[in-house]
Amino acid sequence: MEEEKASAAQSLIDVVNEIAAISDYRITVKKLCYNLARRLKLLVPMFEEIRESNEPISEDTLKTLMNLKEAMCSAKDYLKFCSQGSKIYLVMEREQVTSKLMEVSVKLEQSLSQIPYEELDISDEVREQVELVLSQFRRAKGRVDVSDDELYEDLQSLCNKSSDVDAYQPVLERVAKKLHLMEIPDLAQESVALHEMVASSGGDVGENIEEMAMVLKMIKDFVQTEDDNGEEQKVGVNSRSNGQTSTAASQKIPVIPDDFRCPISLEMMRDPVIVSSGQTYERTCIEKWIEGGHSTCPKTQQALTSTTLTPNYVLRSLIAQWCEANDIEPPKPPSSLRPRKVSSFSSPAEANKIEDLMWRLAYGNPEDQRSAAGEIRLLAKRNADNRVAIAEAGAIPLLVGLLSTPDSRIQEHSVTALLNLSICENNKGAIVSAGAIPGIVQVLKKGSMEARENAAATLFSLSVIDENKVTIGALGAIPPLVVLLNEGTQRGKKDAATALFNLCIYQGNKGKAIRAGVIPTLTRLLTEPGSGMVDEALAILAILSSHPEGKAIIGSSDAVPSLVEFIRTGSPRNRENAAAVLVHLCSGDPQHLVEAQKLGLMGPLIDLAGNGTDRGKRKAAQLLERISRLAEQQKETAVSQPEEEAEPTHPESTTEAADT
């Protein structure tokens, strides 16, 4: 049963990890899906404590855990569909989508309610967290709305009309923008999603599928018309400037070589990248393909052994040379990378500079990217307005992409630029949404020392948001932070410590830090006054001592003498943190309290109770109460023991023994 319990708990953790790996959701259901995924992630600490516990569980309890797994798998399938499914379907069939979400939520609530928590060896903090999740599922009942009414009505109006694009251009434009179907790769992915729905259901997905296909065709025609109009206007302007007719100009445009076209979009590539099969694609197109759940090369159908995309600088240079030779404007960056209007807070000169930097980041050679990332790093450090402007210009996804570059200097500039941008609260969410955490963790593991320090500082900045604490911990940031705390420079240790402190506020990260070996490092830093890390070490220990594993390891590390000394001579903050650690150590374990008393705890403790910080006074009062209780117990024991020993002794025998 012990193995079955551990296996069940691990399988639940695996399901949550699969849910956490779902990177994004369709815009119409994004908030609902993120809320559902966030609640499920909060259950991980319970599963970890069940897995690591030595206490056996009954067969009935094991069944309730497996029922929860079944409910979570249903939630995972629902979230996958909301990530990869048809955007049009999610709006037009909103009642079904709502009903399915309610069904999933009810199933999760019922499964969680059936678990006999009193039989599980889990901490009070984790139990409270599970109860919070359960209450959130209960409150969420009947409050589901997956799309706005205007979008739904627009789609219905398109279904009820003819397929004449010109007649419904305002509606089509509104729908295409709201559903993010303004680019050819997005339209291709939507088409694939509709086809996969048909295939998975045996060709029968309801009466509305034909209407959805018709609406998609109307949107495609509208987008194509818009693109054609844009090209005609561009050609017309160029030809008028040369004193020629647009017809003559168009006749001069040469045929684009096939090697310059993306095999997916058939358009000239603007940001060519190589996949593991050796084929080259437009970056945005192949990213959409991979994000859609495909694991094969679109052209060769070979399995992709890696999702790494390598910039094809040679082809990019050839395309630029061909454009110049044929007097054609080089291809603009894709919309996601194209420099957007820079914030009005920046000066015109800085606005132009930022746009140029975006171009160099996206399309420059390594030397251009290195200098551009370095300049963005400095601009973002300078003031708040620049941080807003740089983010609005689209720098964040470009910088995230450069975190994986083999060039250590580009890597260092990029992670530091993200650190400076993260000072702006609104940028924190954008950085995490851009998928920055895995790249930052990789820099933290293998970057230069300065890059590692700045990666740690970036994680600290991002972890200010509670949801990010869960994400950062789940993506493996804690072990390399512990390594940096142990072997980094003075600044690196400080950055690692502040990040670890923030992350360990979340209960689920405490066990990760403890298992990564942070406590021996922290206790060593306590005994090295010259390290300048005493404040940070005590603050983290105060958090970790509330965890059962943490309490046990601290208790076995001979930390009590140091804690008593800090209560006696430390700063106000160190005194309160040392007292907080001691409170946890002495809870249910009087030997530490006895040791502390022998070391002269009482005097400093009374002083702390009268002159410490508010928290310090509370902790001192708790310790004094425990000391008082222990003294009473010792007194009762001392009184009862002589009576028990005196009973078999008689006066005669005592005298006799004395005479002898």
Swiss-Prot record:
InterPro entries attached to this UniProt entry: Adaptor_Cbl_N_dom_sf, ARM-like, ARM-type_fold, Armadillo, RING-Ubox_PUB, Ubox_domain, Znf_RING/FYVE/PHD
Keyword Repeat: yes
Database matches in SUPFAM superfamilies: ARM repeat (SSF48371), RING/U-box (SSF57850)
Biological process, per Gene Ontology: cell surface receptor signaling pathway; defense response to bacterium; negative regulation of apoptotic process; negative regulation of immune response; protein ubiquitination; regulation of photoperiodism, flowering
Pfam families: Arm, PUB10_N, U-box
Annotated spans, Disordered: 227-252, 631-660
Broad enzyme group: transferase
Location of the protein in the cell: Nucleus; Cytoplasm
Listed pathway(s): Protein modification; protein ubiquitination
EC number: 2.3.2.27
Biased composition (Polar residues): 236-250, 651-660
Catalytic function, reaction form: S-ubiquitinyl-[E2 ubiquitin-conjugating enzyme]-L-cysteine + [acceptor protein]-L-lysine = [E2 ubiquitin-conjugating enzyme]-L-cysteine + N(6)-ubiquitinyl-[acceptor protein]-L-lysine
U-box domain span: 255-329
Repeat (ARM) residue spans along the chain: 384-423, 425-464, 466-505, 507-546, 548-587
Subunit structure and binding partners: Binds to SD11, SD16, SD17, SD18, SD113, SD129 and SD25.
Name of the featured protein: U-box domain-containing protein 13
Natural source organism: Arabidopsis thaliana (Mouse-ear cress)
Annotated gene: PUB13
